[in-house]
């Protein structure tokens, strides 16, 4: 039996060690032959020599590839050739892998992250824990001396206890007279004795409880202090302590260190995980707890040492018993996974699945996919609809049964770009195949074995469930629908199939092996035809050396292109370098956006001239590619390819047309005649239209640049498949069908884009859950695989899975499913709920959590670069309502993928602030506990139990869920934020367009006549001419130049080119509105137009034109519609938001008057307000304490940007993204207007607006101010600032805020010693420089000094029940965002193995197909049992349902259920099987996944109900148990209600024994770290004040007394309760213990909380609920 493996280094080479137990003896085997390696996939095998030369450095040693080997592997089922690269040492791999991956010839590298010893187990097929060896186990535990404030391991170890099959003993160094105690002289001797015991007993397994994080570390520290060699390994080595996440893990070489704590934490849900609590939960027996202070007291006084020794012995004994209980399951898991028990017991479920698949992949010669990087992770985090859940039939039911459930042959021809017509079996991932839209990239190639019938349709052979599109027509429309191949055999398919007559022509053309030189010559000729010139010039000059005149013959080749056409420029350069060995010079053409590439060499000129003279004999596709890249464009409006030439170049268009005709590409040419400067001109246009022409161009020619190819692909996808009978690319064909038998490989392709491609010239379509995976062969390598005989198609989602051979995952799941069934049988046999949970854990691979935020939380979000503050619930609800058709559902979770949204976030590695894209919005229906987390700074956030904030552990930020956060914890908040910064221009037109039309009735726009006379009409005539509707105006050139300035057209030497037809069309609409509505205002020599008359068009006016206009009221003030947002405007806005007021009121003439007032008592401030207001709004009024802007335009501006009332004031959104000076100016104006200096010298900003308070925090963070606190009193929010701001100086020293210190707890955790106070960054640096702090450890905290994140302390955590929607975001890369009042960093949400985004074999299509089949089978089965067998289904979830026959007795229900099973299982396919899971006498169902049932043996099973926890009072537990029994055992709802009323009555009359009211809660941290004082903390603090030692782990047992004031003040230790003096608080126990324990259960029967109290007893009309519905 293999226990473990590792490796050591000998002479620089690795040696594998295998620790084994064989025939009862321990042995170590060595393997010196195994070499580290990984795989590399190369573009070209010739590059392997370059790869072999790559070097790196590791600790001064040069790392190289030792040797290489070419191997045949499969990647997702598809054969692939890769290079296996071997190295000298395992540590060489991480040193060199990135350099190899970055080599341009390397496509990717694989399996580089598998640890060497684990790799050895996989490659050699070795399975740990396999065999029948009996393992010797030894458990141990230590007791230590501790005084409050001491550093870890400062106190000595007092006792070491150990236990094995022979019993338990204790070693100590004080005299204790007990038979199982061995007494030695000193602590040193005690440890040496223990080491001797381990050596003599030589256990294979060392069992601890939290030994990873306590016992071993303590022993190691004490051994170092006492000079003891802590040798526990069988090779004489000391235990190896290594970090594993935020915890530690300890290895003992040659022995299995089995730490029970991580195993139990992941398998059993308990309120506390003390050894005592776990032992009682597992074995049902109590165990005495002796607290640390009691141990210390006993040791120092010598009294009660026997009790401590007994406690120590029992610790070792129960640890041994727990080890025996849990080790067999972990050993079984180790055998299944194929990795060591040490690894398996500390691994997450996802990692276990991964290691299992890695081993199986190697066995099947499959190359393992790489783990996703952060970018791929973000792409994967998408949701899909979950399993079917039927809403329950509420009430009490009898005689219930529960039933539950157990996916183109190789010579098919396809056209591949660059390869021509090949067999589908030869296609590789990354190839481009001929599809419905031309070339489409192959994402995956699937290969399977198949044996069975193929359907032959016109020569295309496919499996029966393969789909082909079929076209049917009637008088009105053409319809294209997919039909299964097997349907063609039934003659039910009416219509024609789609083929292409060009299949073989395109295949032949793309397969032509044209030499690169011919391709380059053709492209060069086409480029010169479009954009080039050949220049030959004779220049006479005087040769001074020879004293005579000479002639210089100059030859030059020039090509002029756009400056931004980088790909085109690079291609031209490449052509000249490859053909002529010369690099062209590049120069910019002044005043243009063009560059010219030049070569001035005679020999090059002559060669190029020869090429051009023979252009028609060159490779036509290459010539056309060059020409269209230079002079062609994709017209986005017409979705066509257009090339245009001027008057003298008709021959070029004719030549291009001739070449296109040779290739069979349909096109049109036409001539456009016009006059320019009195001369007749012609423009010759060639256009390729229609989907057929575009596809032929794309497949046979294509563009050079990716940009133009992308535009072409988009145009193709937007083109409809019209006129299929008369089409250059598609044809409609009748079909003939037959069948034949086939045995062999079948293939499928997964494509990017539309899932159709041509095969043989015919267009072709591209738990319960484990059982479905096996039945339907659901696997990444069977998904949408072309060429199979048979497919299973997932309902609704339409993904196809090849059935011709077993997929990688399904074939493995068969074994797992069999194992699962064995486990389920054991689960049925056990009556122990803990064992059930443990076994249930083993059959699950993934647990999906709903982690969310409450709807009212504030969220800053950037949309198109603008900052918005919204309630997270309002944002997500609105967007999901607006995009209802795009919302995906996964069970109770709704997901909407979005674009254009960003949120502030921090980089998890650097802790720097960043903006990150929001991938999806998430909404989840939730019922359960929610936690309001309040921070010391005044921030607060409300989250569900599973949602995470970021807290610090061992110097690193880690995710901590809501139910784990406690007062005193430190959580991440922003120090500073990086927002996009740019100069803004306030556009009043856009602002006014957002106001109601009635508000802009008297708003006008004006422009001076000068320079604009007749301009509007002239421009409109020119635009109509451009669109071919009028003759060319005489003055067209003037307007064309204006259009060129605006970027709509480009003028040429002759004529012009329209750059953007869509925008030009909109611009024309603007001028049609202006010409119709502009009038001349002679008094002011201006043109005037009413704003509302052009409201529909004015928004598209170019800014260059808009800045010439004025805007305002007809008879009043007008101003520029474009206002630069500078510091003056920002300060004015700050004044307004703080103490401004905008007013609209009726005037004496029954009209409206508008004004804006800015208030202040300081004359100097009023002077500044007046100066700023008059700058923007002209003349203003000055009052005693105000400045008034009596302008409507001013009112509209301030109202729309900033709000009116104090409660709805806000910061204009553009302020956040303005330059820092502008943001500071706003803050200065705000501070002067509504700020003050608090008596403690803090700056204070005040507002009644909660939104504004949050905005102020964000704005302050954006200028680097982090010392912010928030308060709220008398309806006013206060923002306190403890930093200097540029506009205010304070002379008093301030107390440091959280953002200015490193918390002492963090320092203690990192440096391992006690710090008495927090430390400033300056002091911290000095301590490091002075050598007082370890620099290496200090580096772990560098992010707290240099990063953009600081720590804020949790002050209180309040818990409440919640029913409703909760919300979350999926954020790219960083997985966090800012949310909550005052802004807190929250972790974003994660969404069995297929859907796990971090999985190597991730497959979203597989996951959603499995759930789709699940929904189909469960709904079909429910329909069958109800309609044919008379059952009523009461409740169902994803993989089973509860049903009964109303009125039938138990035996009838059982009999009919068995008959139905026989019937339905004959109909269900494959491994799917409906099972008889159990019969229940009675049950009730509350809501989804919340129910309780009782079986025939009286065993009650509950799911999802609020079952009381172990730390609730006995009266609550007892009442709930009695209520469940009354409902389920007696079937009596009235009795259940009576029980509750009786208990509440007894409580009210003080008739309940006090011992039933004791509440037990555990202290989880040092008392000084508790800021919020719950009852147990209040009691603990009072005990501590009396000298009682309280440590983390201490359980406080208390009772709450009647009285006034806080509950904590009325809670006392139970042993102090005196019935003669004290009365318990009956109301507290009723409201907080008894009613919560039963309320949710009885709510299912129509009862409310008030109905259950004896004081409010009343009859309710609930007779329908009171009788069992099954009777």
UniProtKB/Swiss-Prot annotation:
Lineage top rank: taxon: Archaea
Keyword Ribosomal protein on entry: no
Disulfide pairings: 788-802, 1403-1406
Gene3D superfamilies: DNA polymerase family B, C-terminal domain, DNA Polymerase, chain B, domain 1, Hedgehog/Intein (Hint) domain, Homing endonucleases, Intein homing endonuclease, domain III, Intein homing endonuclease, domain IV, Palm domain of DNA polymerase, Ribonuclease H-like superfamily/Ribonuclease H
One GO term of the biological process aspect: DNA-templated DNA replication
Region of interest: 3'-5' exonuclease: 135-326
Applications (biotechnology): Pyrococcus kodakaraensis enzyme is a very fast, thermostable DNA polymerase (130 nucleotides/s) used in high-performance PCR.
Pfam families registered for this protein in UniProt: DNA_pol_B (PF00136), DNA_pol_B_exo1 (PF03104), Intein_splicing (PF14890), LAGLIDADG_3 (PF14528), PI-TkoII_IV (PF18714)
SMART domains for the chain: HintC (SM00305), HintN (SM00306), POLBc (SM00486)
Reported temperature dependence: DNA polymerase optimum temperature is 75 degrees Celsius, for protein cloned without inteins in E.coli. Both intein endonucleases are thermostable.
DOD-type homing endonuclease domain residues: 524-665, 1132-1265
Activity at various pH: DNA polymerase optimum pH is 6.5, very thermostable, has a half-life of 12 hours at 95 and 3 hours at 100 degrees Celsius, for protein cloned without inteins in E.coli.
Coiled coil: none
EC nos: 2.7.7.7, 3.1.-.-
Record keywords: Autocatalytic cleavage, Disulfide bond, DNA replication, DNA-binding, DNA-directed DNA polymerase, Endonuclease, Exonuclease, Hydrolase, Intron homing, Nuclease, Nucleotidyltransferase, Protein splicing, Repeat, Transferase
UniProt entry tagged with the keyword Transferase: yes
Reaction catalysis annotation: DNA(n) + a 2'-deoxyribonucleoside 5'-triphosphate = DNA(n+1) + diphosphate
GO molecular function: DNA binding; DNA-directed DNA polymerase activity; endonuclease activity; exonuclease activity; nucleotide binding
Posttranslational mods: Undergoes a protein self splicing that involves a post-translational excision of the intervening region (intein) followed by peptide ligation.
Physiological role: Has high processivity, a high polymerization rate and high fidelity. In addition to polymerase activity, also exhibits 3' to 5' exonuclease activity. Intein encoded endonucleases are thought to mediate intein mobility by site-specific recombination initiated by endonuclease cleavage at the 'homing site' in genes that lack the intein. Given the high intracellular K(+) content (>0.5 M), PI-PkoII is probably more active than PI-PkoI in vivo.
Similarity comment: family membership: Belongs to the DNA polymerase type-B family.
Designated name of the protein: DNA polymerase
């Amino acid at each position: 039996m293999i226990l473990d493996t590792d490796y050591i280094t000998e002479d620089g080479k690795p040696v594998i060690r295998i620790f084994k137990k064989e025939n009862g003896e321990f042995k170590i085997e060595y393997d010196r032959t195994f070499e580290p390696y990984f795989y590399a996939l190369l573009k070209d095998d010739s590059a392997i020599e370059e790869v072999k030369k790559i070097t790196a450095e590791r600790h001064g040693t040069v790392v190289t590839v030792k040797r290489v080997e070419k191997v045949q592997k499969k990647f997702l089922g598809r054969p692939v050739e890769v290079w296996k690269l071997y190295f000298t040492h395992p540590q060489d791999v991480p040193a060199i892998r990135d350099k190899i991956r970055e080599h341009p010839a390397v496509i990717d590298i694989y399996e580089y992250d598998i640890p060497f010893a684990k790799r050895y187990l996989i490659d050699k097929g070795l399975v740990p824990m396999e065999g029948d060896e009996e393992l010797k186990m030894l458990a141990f535990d230590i007791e230590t001396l501790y005084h409050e404030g001491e550093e870890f391991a400062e106190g000595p170890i007092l006792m070491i206890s150990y236990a094995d099959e022979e019993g338990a003993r204790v070693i100590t160094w004080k005299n204790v007279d007990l038979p199982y105690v061995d007494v030695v002289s000193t602590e040193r001797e005690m440890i040496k004795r223990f080491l001797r015991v381990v050596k003599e007993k030589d256990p294979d397994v060392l069992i601890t409880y939290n030994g990873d994080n306590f016992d071993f570390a303590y022993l190691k520290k004490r051994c170092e202090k006492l000079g003891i060699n802590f040798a526990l390994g069988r090779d004489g080595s000391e235990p190896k302590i290594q970090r594993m996440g935020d915890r530690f893990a300890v290895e003992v070489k040659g022995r299995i260190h089995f730490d029970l704590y991580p195993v139990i934490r992941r398998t059993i849900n308990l309120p506390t995980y003390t050894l005592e609590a776990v032992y009682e939960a597992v074995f049902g027996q109590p165990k005495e707890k002796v607290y640390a202070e009691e141990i210390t007291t006993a040791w120092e006084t010598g009294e009660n040492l026997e009790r401590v020794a007994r406690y120590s012995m029992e610790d070792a004994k129960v640890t041994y018993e727990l080890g025996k209980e849990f080790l067999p399951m972990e050993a079984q898991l180790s055998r299944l996974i194929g990795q060591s028990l040490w690894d398996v017991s500390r691994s997450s479920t996802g990692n276990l699945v991964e290691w299992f698949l890695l081993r199986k992949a190697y066995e099947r010669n499959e190359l393992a996919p790489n783990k996703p990087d952060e970018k791929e992770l973000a792409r994967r985090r998408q949701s899909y609809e979950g399993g079917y859940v039927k809403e329950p039939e509420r009430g009490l039911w009898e005689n219930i049964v529960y039933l539950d459930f157990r996916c183109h042959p190789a010579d098919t021809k396809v056209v591949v770009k660059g390869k021509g017509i090949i067999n589908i079996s030869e296609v590789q991932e990354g190839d481009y195949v001929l599809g419905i839209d031309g070339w489409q990239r192959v994402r995956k190639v699937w290969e399977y074995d198949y044996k069975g019938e193929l359907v032959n349709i016109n020569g295309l052979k496919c499996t029966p469930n393969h789909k082909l599109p079929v076209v049917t027509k009637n008088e009105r429309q053409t319809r294209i629908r997919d039909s299964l191949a097997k349907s063609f055999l039934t003659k039910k398919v009416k219509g024609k199939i789609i083929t292409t007559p060009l299949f073989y022509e395109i295949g032949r053309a793309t397969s032509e092996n044209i030499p690169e030189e011919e391709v380059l010559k053709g492209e060069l000729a086409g480029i010169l035809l479009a954009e080039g010139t050949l220049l030959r010039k004779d220049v006479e000059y005087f040769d001074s050396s020879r004293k005579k005149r000479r002639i210089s013959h100059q030859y030059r080749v020039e090509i002029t292109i756009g400056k931004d056409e980088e790909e085109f420029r690079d291609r031209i350069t490449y052509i000249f370098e490859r053909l002529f060995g010369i690099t062209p010079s590049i120069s910019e053409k002044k005043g243009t956006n063009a560059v010219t590439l030049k070569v001035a060499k005679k020999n090059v000129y002559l060669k190029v001239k020869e090429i051009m003279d023979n252009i028609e004999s060159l490779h036509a596709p290459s010539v056309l590619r060059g020409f269209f890249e230079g002079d062609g464009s994709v017209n986005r409006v017409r979705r066509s390819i257009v090339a245009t030439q001027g008057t003298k170049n008709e021959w070029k268009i004719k030549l291009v047309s001739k070449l296109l005709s040779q290739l069979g590409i349909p096109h049109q040419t036409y001539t456009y005649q016009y006059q320019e400067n009195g001369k007749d001109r012609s423009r010759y246009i060639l256009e390729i239209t229609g989907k057929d022409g575009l596809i032929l161009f794309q497949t046979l020619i294509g563009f050079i640049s990716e940009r133009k190819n992308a535009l072409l692909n988009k145009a193709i996808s937007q083109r409809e498949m019209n006129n299929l009978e008369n089409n250059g690319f598609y044809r409609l064909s009748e079909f003939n069908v037959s069948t034949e038998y086939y045995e062999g490989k079948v293939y499928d392709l997964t494509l990017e884009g539309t899932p159709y491609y041509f095969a043989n010239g015919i267009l072709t379509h591209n738990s319960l859950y484990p059982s479905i995976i096996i039945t339907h062969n659901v696997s990444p390598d069977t998904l949408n695989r072309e060429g199979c005989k048979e497919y299973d198609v997932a309902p609704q989602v339409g993904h196809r899975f090849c059935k011709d051979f077993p997929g990688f995952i399904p074939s493995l799941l068969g074994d797992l499913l069999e194992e699962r069934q064995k486990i389920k049988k054991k689960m049925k046999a056990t009556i122990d709920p803990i064992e059930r949970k443990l076994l249930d854990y083993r059959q699950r691979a993934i647990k999906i959590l709903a982690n969310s935020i409450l709807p009212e939380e504030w969220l800053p979000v950037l949309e198109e670069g603008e900052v918005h503050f919204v309630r997270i619930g309002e944002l997500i609800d609105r967007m999901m309502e607006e995009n209802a058709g795009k919302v995906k559902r996964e069970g109770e979770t709704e997901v909407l993928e979005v674009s254009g949204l960003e949120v502030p976030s921090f980089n998890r590695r650097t802790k720097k602030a960043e903006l990150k894209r929001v991938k999806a919005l998430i909404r989840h229906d939730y019922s359960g506990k929610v936690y309001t987390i309040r921070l010391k700074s005044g921030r607060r956030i409300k989250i569900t139990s599973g949602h995470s904030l970021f807290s610090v552990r061992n110097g690193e930020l880690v995710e901590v869920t809501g139910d784990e956060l406690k007062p005193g914890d430190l959580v991440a908040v922003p120090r500073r934020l990086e927002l996009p910064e740019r100069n803004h221009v306030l556009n009043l037109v856009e602002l006014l367009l957002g106001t109601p039309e009635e508000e802009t009735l008297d708003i006008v726009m004006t422009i001076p006549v000068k320079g604009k006379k007749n301009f509007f009409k002239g421009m409109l005539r020119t635009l109509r001419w451009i669109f071919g509707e009028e003759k060319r105006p005489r003055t067209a050139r003037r307007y064309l130049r204006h259009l060129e300035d605006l970027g709509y057209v480009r003028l040429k030497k002759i004529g012009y080119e329209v750059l953007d037809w869509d925008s030009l069309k909109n611009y024309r609409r603007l001028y049609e509105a202006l010409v119709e509505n502009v009038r001349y205002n002679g008094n002011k020599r201006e043109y005037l137009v009413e704003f509302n008359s052009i409201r529909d068009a004015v928004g598209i006016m170019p800014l260059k034109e808009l800045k010439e206009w004025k805007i305002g009221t007809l008879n009043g003030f007008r101003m520029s519609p474009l206002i630069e947002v500078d510091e003056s405007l920002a300060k004015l806005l700050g004044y307004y938001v703080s103490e401004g007021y905008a007013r609209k009121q009726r005037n004496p003439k029954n009209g409206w008057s508008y004004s804006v007032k800015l208030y202040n008592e300081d004359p100097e401030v009023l002077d500044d307000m007046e100066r700023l207001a008059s700058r923007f709004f002209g003349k203003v009024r000055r009052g005693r304490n105000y400045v008034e802007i009596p302008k409507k335009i001013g009112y509209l501006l301030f109202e729309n940007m900033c709000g009116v009332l104090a409660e709805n004031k806000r910061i204009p959104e553009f302020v956040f993204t303005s330059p820092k000076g502008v943001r500071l100016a706003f803050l200065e104006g705000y501070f002067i207007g509504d700020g003050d200096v608090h008596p403690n010298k803090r700056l204070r900003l005040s507002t009644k607006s909660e939104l504004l308070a949050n905005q102020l925090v964000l704005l302050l963070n954006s200028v680097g101010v982090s010392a912010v606190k928030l308060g709220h009193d008398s309806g006013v929010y206060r923002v306190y600032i403890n930093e200097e701001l540029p506009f205010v100086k304070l002379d008093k020293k301030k107390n440091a805020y959280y953002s200015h210190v490193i918390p002492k707890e963090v320092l203690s955790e990192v440096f391992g010693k006690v710090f008495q106070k927090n430390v400033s960054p300056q002091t911290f640096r000095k301590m490091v420089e002075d050598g007082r702090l370890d620099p290496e450890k200090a580096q772990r905290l560098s992010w707290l000094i240099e990063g953009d994140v600081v720590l804020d302390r949790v002050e209180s955590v309040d818990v409440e029940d919640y029913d409703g929607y909760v919300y979350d975001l999926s954020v790219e890369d960083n997985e966090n965002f800012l949310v909550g009042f005052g802004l807190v960093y929250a972790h974003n949400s994660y969404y069995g193995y297929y859907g796990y985004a971090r999985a190597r074999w991730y497959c979203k299509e597989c996951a959603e197909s499995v759930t789709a089949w699940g929904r189909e089978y469960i709904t079909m089965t429910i329909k069958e049992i109800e309609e044919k067998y008379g059952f009523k289904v009461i409740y169902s979830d994803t993989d089973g349902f509860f049903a009964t026959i109303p009125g039938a007795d138990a035996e009838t229900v059982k009999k009919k259920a068995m008959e139905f099973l026989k019937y339905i299982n004959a109909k269900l396919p494959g491994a799917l099987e409906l099972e008889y899971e159990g019969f229940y006498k009675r049950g009730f169902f509350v809501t989804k996944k919340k129910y309780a049932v009782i079986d025939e043996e009286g065993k009650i099973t509950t799911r999802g109900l609020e079952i009381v926890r172990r730390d609730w009072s006995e009266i609550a537990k007892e009442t709930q148990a009695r209520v469940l029994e009354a409902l389920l055992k007696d079937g009596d709802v009235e009795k259940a209600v009576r029980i509750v009323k009786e208990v509440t009555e007894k409580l009210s009359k003080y008739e309940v024994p006090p011992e039933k009211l004791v509440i037990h809660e555990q202290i989880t941290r040092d008392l000084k770290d508790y800021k919020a004082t719950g009852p147990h903390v209040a009691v603990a603090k009072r005990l501590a004040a009396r000298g009682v030692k309280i440590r983390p782990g201490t359980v406080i047992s208390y009772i709450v007394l009647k009285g006034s004031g806080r509950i904590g003040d009325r809670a006392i230790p139970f042993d102090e309760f005196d019935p003669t003096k004290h009365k318990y608080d009956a109301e507290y126990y009723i409201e907080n213990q008894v009613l919560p324990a039963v309320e949710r259960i009885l709510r299912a029967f129509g009862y409310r909380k008030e109905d259950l109290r004896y004081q409010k007893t009343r009859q309710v009309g609930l007779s329908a609920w009171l009788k069992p519905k099954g009777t």
